[in-house]
Amino acid sequence: MARPKLWPWGILLLVSLLSAGFNLDTMNVCPSLDIRSEVAELRRLENCSVVEGHLQILLMFTATGEDFRSLSFPHLTQVTDYLLLFRVYGLESLRDLFPNLAVIRGAHLFLGYALVIFEMPHLRDVGLPALGAVLHGSVRVEKNQELCHLSTIDWGLLQPTPSTNYIVGNKLGEECADVCPGTLGAAGEPCARTTFNGHTDYRCWTSSHCQRVCPCPQGLACTISGECCHTECLGGCSQPEDPRACVACRHFYYQSACHRACPLGTYEHESWRCVTAESCANLRSVPGRASTFGIHQGKCLAQCPPGFTRNGSSIFCHKCEGLCPKECKVGTKTIDSVQAAQDLVGCTHVEGSLILNLRRGYNLEPELQRSLGLVETITGFLKIKHSFALVSLSFFKNLKLIRGDTMVDGNYTLYVLDNQNLQQLGPWVSAGLTIPVGKIYFAFNPRLCLEHIYRLEEVTGTRGRQNKAEINPRTNGDRAACQTRTLRFVSNVTEADRILLRWERYEPLEARDLLSFIVYYKESPFQNATEHVGPDACGSQSWNLLDVELPLSRTQEPGVILAPLKPWTQYAVFVRAITLTTAEDSPHQGAQSPIVYLWTLPAAPTVPQDVISSSNSSSHLLVRWKPPTQRNGNITYYLVLWQRLAEDGDLYLNDYCHRGLRLPTSNHDPRFDREDGDLEAELELGCCPCQHAPPGQVLPALEAQEASFQKKFENFLHNAITIPKPPWKVTSIHRNLQRDAGRHRRAIGSPRPGGNSSDFEIQEDKVPRERAVLGGLRHFTEYRIDIHACNHAAHIVGCSAATFVFARTMPRREADDIPGKLSWEAASKSSVLLRWFEPPDPNGLILKYEIKYRRLGEEATVLCVSRLRYAKVGGVQLALLPPGNYSARVRATSLAGNGSWTDSVAFYIPGPEEEDSGGLHILLTVTPAGLMLLIILAALGFFYSRKRNGTLYTSVNPEYLSASDMYIPDEWEVPREQISIIRELGQGSFGMVYEGVAKGLEAGEESTPVALKTVNELASPRERIEFLKEASVMKAFQCHHVVRLLGVVSQGQPTLVIMELMTRGDLKSHLRSLRPEAENNPGIPRPALGDMIQMAGEIADGMAYLAANKFVHRDLAARNCMVSQDFTVKIGDFGMTRDVYETDYYRKGGKGLLPVRWMAPESLKDGIFTTHSDVWSFGVVLWEIVTLAEQPYQGLSNEQVLKFVMDGGVLEELEDCPHQLQELMSSCWQQNPRLRPTFTQILNSIQKELRPSFRLLSFYHSPECQGGCGLQPTTDAESSSPPTSKGASDCSLQNGGPEH
């Protein structure tokens, strides 16, 4: 079967798993982990195999790359909820930290995301080579300025629905060197290619770790060798088809094995493992508390679902009869929000007491009814105080009993105090509420009518238990003003987030009339607050209230701490005494303080917002931002620090002559053109935005979702960032500026991955406004800019943490110009070496050079030279130039684009006659010393020649061509001056191959397009012999489906072999260009069955001709077949593409390169090459045609292919392959060579489906073969006989020839 190529990640994964001792038997489950501030905290992950919950790693500002190099947690294979990384400095990749993390289950998500990587300043790649599945949730990768290798990840291999991923704000793809293993010069074999979001590419996590692509159906995992795991495995396995060898489980894990469903007697827990009933009973939601877990419908749940309950003797959840009894032990629970009430959803029996203190909210009754509507019994007391948001108590629609096991102050079972808007007691009267013991107490409910209270007395049976003071007519249902006494504050102490207040003790006439104090406070920018404490126009309370109990000592002054408060904010505060009077004829007595205004102390501001940058010149950057959301003082200045960043040196690894070049930009931001002023609309004075959306108006779903996530995420960041100490807090700008700058340099000056940014100086400036102009910068250079907000107390509290932005200056126009003049020197008789100096201070990096040269009277030729190629000789060599006058010029291309062309330089290539006369002139004018030198050189040459002639060269076909290094020109010789070179086509097996034009080569044609093969000038004698041998072989071939030799230029250097020009290149490249996702797709549809059979017929015809000429090809493959302009396929020129596709060959035992993936088993075993073995290779070529040139035996190394084929293996049958072609392939791959068809038999089977032009042009239908002769299988030995010059010799040979 065909197996995908699995990069050595598989071996590394296996080694790491073995070294980690991975086994399902040794699984260690850890709870959710929040790791922050210190790298040492990561040690909590040691020995964790599974994190049952979430894993958060965040806010490590002082960490460096060195801190992480010794850390690795190979045991960790899965996280059941989500993985979040945020602002971890120094961490460059996760590949060493979590080398075996295979699964993120996403059982509970972070705002819909299972993987969040946010603002990781030094992260260069995600690097999770073992990750095979993200079961639920999306991926969010945002604002990671160094993060690359995102375009090479196929998220579709990991997620069921990757379309909701959010990957923005990372390093631009054109600035990344996203090179996968085995491509563009990277080490190793190529990774698998897949199509994701319409783009086909190699898939890898890093430049040395491929992404796993398993060949298994339905997304099954696989072993490192590509064998399919058990269907219940997830993320990989160590043995195929073994549920105990899984890295993680697709469904459930129990007793060291994976199961589709939990075994009998066990129950699902957290959607990934099975537990017994005993284990479920021992689980705790909160350590130290009683277990609330119950078993329902085969699942172990933290609580029984609504409508079900668990009794004391069983862990199983039972359906309730009627209203479901659910006992909730709460102790004394305060409900001060809707969220707090939700803890009682479904409760019918509250064992404990409830205190309602709902001061804020809008239309709370429906929400409270969902939470408290089923409550029937409260065993303790019910206390409702200061609940200004309540209008009715109807949400207690089923409340029947308040038992009074515990009471307020030992007396009161129902206690209703100071509820300014309470008007109705709800259904208590009609439902028959019972209060068997204790009193009821109502006070300071000005909107609650007394008749409701008196009626409640009768229903509950409490009439006569309480006195008139406990249901006071003066404070219930009465909004009349009372006589008050002024309370005075005696002290206050303010801090940044709190105020400590004390006031004088109030002594009413009757001490028992004083109940408590209420402190009212609110933000008040202006000193115009009123004492009105009712709801405001938005339905919420404008004042914050704090209930203060009376001090125990009669001499102690009452006081309170108001917290948490906002720094540097003015608050209005007053205090009121809650009193009553027992004397009916006495006026109501009270006490209240005047409103006082207090300022909290300043604190460090939050970070500046919405930083934008732009460049308007090559030496300046403009930066603008908005003030921090919380200034916490008067902003006096902003501290701006900036540092130059090094360019990514990995860009030099790319050959931009062959790879598309997309350059970074430094465009001007149009937002800088706006006028100054607030960009946000001011709210109308005196109005406030209500917290509920206007009826009928909703945000668009996408915008609402995005806005919601951003808001929640920023709230999370704000809460999280206040916990650790800031990484470099400016504690004293004036006295300790130098110390703080040094701390800052350590923070932002950490070496940037791939560069040496720490070598560049950090600049700083203080600016009074929300903008800065940074000058004196280097052209087209990226800078990191950090901005801190500092208020008037910065010398005490420090400045804010930094917000940062990256910006690039504009290019300098002349920076990429090449200095000085272009120089040249003769490298040989037909080549020159052009040299020039690099631009000394370019815009970023120089990526390539372009040379434009032209011969006098001809069109110019443009040659691209990569910087790596330039660096070898400081220029470039122009070879194979016909004689004549030339001019050349050059320009550089940097990250900013093209520089200017240099001035042209002229040079001259002499002709053969001039070379001869020049040599004679030298001989006639040399000095005696020169003559002596020539004599010595001649002697050395003589001895060298004697030695060379004594060397014996072996030939694969020793009788076919003499190994002599002499070449005798014949009728094939073409004068060199008739040849013109146009451009490079590629590298051949002996040297460069060019496209050119030959004049007068063919009768009736003025010029003929040709391909020119060369031999390297430094080639060895052996290589020159082989080069001439190949030319001599081609002279004998005259077949339409074999590439023709047109001539030889053997006089002078270098030697040229002139071939028929095949404009569409080799068949392998042509087939790959027909893939729909190919970037160079010519717009031609995928070959139909008829097209594929036509290609097969043309190749078979060319091979039949070679077989008739007793020639064994030995390297038949799509790469060695050529495609002409009219799409005719011809057998190539035997070796031209070997260097181009070097990875298709394998060196066995130190011998020559072998195309093992195309070779027959007898060739691999015994080195036998016959026409039969060529037929085997023809079958592989058919497979290439059907798959559009996929690599045969994909997924197997060359060594594995060698063993696989020698053991009788063949390529797997292809899906959707035409039956006719599949049968033809199978016949070519018979293990017995004699059972394979000959090429003429192949043509016999398909000739009816070939186009009519085939009959006119083919060898098969030629007179020499007389319409399909039977050809004798040619052995490698027979192929040594030279073919005749007339083409095919004897076509009447019979099959069954000799075989090695």
From Swiss-Prot:
Residues 483-603, 607-707, 818-912 form the Fibronectin type-III domain. One of its GO terms (cellular component) is axon. One of its GO terms (biological process) is actin cytoskeleton organization. Glycans are attached at residues 47, 311, 411, 492, 528, 616, 634, 756, 885, 898. Residues 1-26 form the signal peptide. It is an enzyme of class 2 (transferase). It comes from the Eukaryota. Residues 740-762, 1270-1300 are annotated as: Disordered. Disulfide bonds join 214-222, 216-228, 229-237, 233-246, 249-258, 262-274, 280-300, 304-317, 320-324, 657-864. Residues 1272-1300 have a biased composition (Polar residues). The keyword Glycoprotein applies. Residues 979-1254 form the Protein kinase domain. It is a single-pass type I membrane protein. Residues 944-1300 are cytoplasmic. It is found in: Membrane. The active site is at 1115 (proton acceptor). It catalyses: L-tyrosyl-[protein] + ATP = O-phospho-L-tyrosyl-[protein] + ADP + H(+). Residues 747-921 are extracellular. ATP binds at residues 985-993, 1013. Its EC number is 2.7.10.1. Probable tetramer of 2 alpha and 2 beta chains linked by disulfide bonds. The alpha chains contribute to the formation of the ligand-binding domain, while the beta chains carry the kinase domain. The extracellular domain is required for sensing alterations in external pH. Receptor with tyrosine-protein kinase activity. Functions as a pH sensing receptor which is activated by increased extracellular pH. Activates an intracellular signaling pathway that involves IRS1 and AKT1/PKB. This is Insulin receptor-related protein. It comes from Cavia porcellus.
